A protein has these predicted regions:
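Short linear interaction motifs
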Residues: 64-68, 132-143, 249-259
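C-terminal outer-membrane/trafficking sorting elements
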Residues: 6, 327-339, 343-414
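Solvent-exposed N-terminal domain segments of exported/luminal and surface proteins
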Residues: 21-135
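Bacterial Sec-dependent N-terminal signal peptides
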Residues: 1-23, 331-333
Length: 414
């Protein structure tokens, strides 16, 4: 009997993948149809290549959603021609943590840059009291909460509200990016408990404003000299204007000082370290917004510093093509194509000749494993309509009734 190598659908709706189909490869919004965004520049991610050690994400830094205007910001988004390198073997940095510097500290799933909470200015230019981008530059953010830097690099310091459905509080948020230490960045919602149990809840930060009446000390207890003092707290320099106005309290919230935690997620059923964006109950961004002042993991070279983000794709790298199939050992490819992914509603399915004449069972499930669609289909081109469902992650399962099945994780967004 022919032996099929097939993927199994677990009860918790996890997609078990080979090393070539892990989330750091499959979580990107690929532009497969030549779509353009701002300035008629190609949008989203142009290509994804991978080796056994790294993933190479090629992007213009222009999203697929409409951006602008930027009140009081004279900068114009431009093609950055980035090639970001994401390690496939992220690890905790057990030594001195690496600070998240100015400029890009990670990349959203659409190829747009992640910036930290700073806006590049500090009181008296000393780098001690650093301005928080949201209260100081927030007026220049567009409706998607992004804006361009002087070099034309469009970016988000805070929750990228147009990238995913941040109002969907009943499902675990999808991966919406990767930090440069290789760990995933999720949207605002996760499992109540880090072991993957409990309700879906909004992830709450452990940071809060300090109870201070002057700026003469730092949150870690450092007593400053008079020349290092920050400005008096008043209406011109209110508490919260500087990131040093915040302190981390371990007993608060779900997340650590890096704005993440070790936890189970839909894409990582065995657990991973994961960052989360933080918002309040009204979806207003909450400090530190994305990744904290330091990375949790070790940061490889190539993405930061002068010229960072312009890596060379190795000649032997494999290009990721957004079609997932099942290999029939010794007899070619038993393949199902599913596209586009992400989708704003319709998912097209195509079948290889191995399926000719077969009747198959189609199941579409949400992130909790609830079956939304179940029907018998012929092995011909099909269209699955998700337009009536909330944005989020879905799983398409196609079974042949003989023990083999095809699974594809689909991201639906607006």
């Amino acid at each position: 009997m022919k032996k099929l190598l097939f993927l199994l659908l677990t009860s918790s709706l996890q997609l078990l993948t080979s090393s070539a189909q892990t989330p750091e490869i499959t979580s990107w919004i690929l532009n497969t149809s030549g779509e353009t965004g701002y300035g008629n520049i190609a949008s989203n991610v142009q290509s994804v290549h991978y080796t056994t050690t790294d993933v190479y994400v090629s992007a213009t830094c222009i999203p697929g959603y409409d951006i602008g205007p930027w009140q009081g910001n004279p900068n114009t988004p431009a093609n950055q021609n980035f090639v970001f390198k994401i390690t496939r073997t992220p690890a905790e940095n057990t030594g001195t943590k690496t600070a998240t510097g100015l400029g890009h500290i990670g990349v959203w799933s659409n190829g747009v840059s992640i910036f930290n909470a700073k806006d590049a200015f500090s009181y008296n230019s000393q780098g001690i009291w650093n301005q928080d981008a949201l209260p100081n530059e927030g007026a220049s953010f567009d409706d998607c909460l992004g804006h361009p830097a002087p070099n034309g690099e469009y970016h988000h310091h805070v929750n990228p509200t147009c990238l995913y459905d941040d109002q969907n509080s009943i499902e675990h948020s999808p991966i919406i990016g990767y930090a440069f230490d290789g760990f995933p960045v999720y949207g605002a919602y996760g499992y109540e408990n880090s072991n993957g149990t409990g309700n879906i809840v909004r992830m709450e930060t452990g940071y809060r404003l300090r109870s201070i009446t002057d700026r003469t000390t730092l949150a870690d207890g450092t007593v400053l000299t008079a020349g290092q003092y920050g400005p008096a707290i008043n209406t011109t320099y209110p508490l919260g204007k500087y990131i040093e106005d915040y302190e981390y309290v371990q007993s608060l919230g779900h997340l650590d000082e890096y704005n993440g935690r070790v936890c189970v997620t839909p894409e990582y059923p065995s657990g991973t370290y994961a960052y989360f964006v933080t918002v309040d109950e009204d979806l207003v961004p909450v400090y530190p917004y994305t990744i904290g002042k330091y990375y949790y993991g070790t940061v490889p070279t190539g993405n930061t510093g002068p010229g960072g983000g312009h890596n060379t794709i190795p000649g032997g790298a494999t290009e990721y093509v957004n079609t997932t199939g099942l290999e029939e050992v010794g007899s070619g490819q038993w393949a199902v194509g599913s596209y586009p992914n992400p989708t704003n509603g319709i998912v097209n399915l195509s079948f290889s000749s191995e399926f000719a004449g077969q009747q198959l069972t189609l199941n579409v499930m949400d992130a909790k494993g609830a079956v939304l669609i179940q029907q018998q289909i012929a092995a011909t081109n099909q269209a699955v309509d998700l337009s009536g469902y909330l944005d989020g992650m879905y799983l398409i399962n196609i079974a042949d009734g003989k023990g083999a099945s095809f699974n594809q994780r689909i991201i639906k967004n607006r």
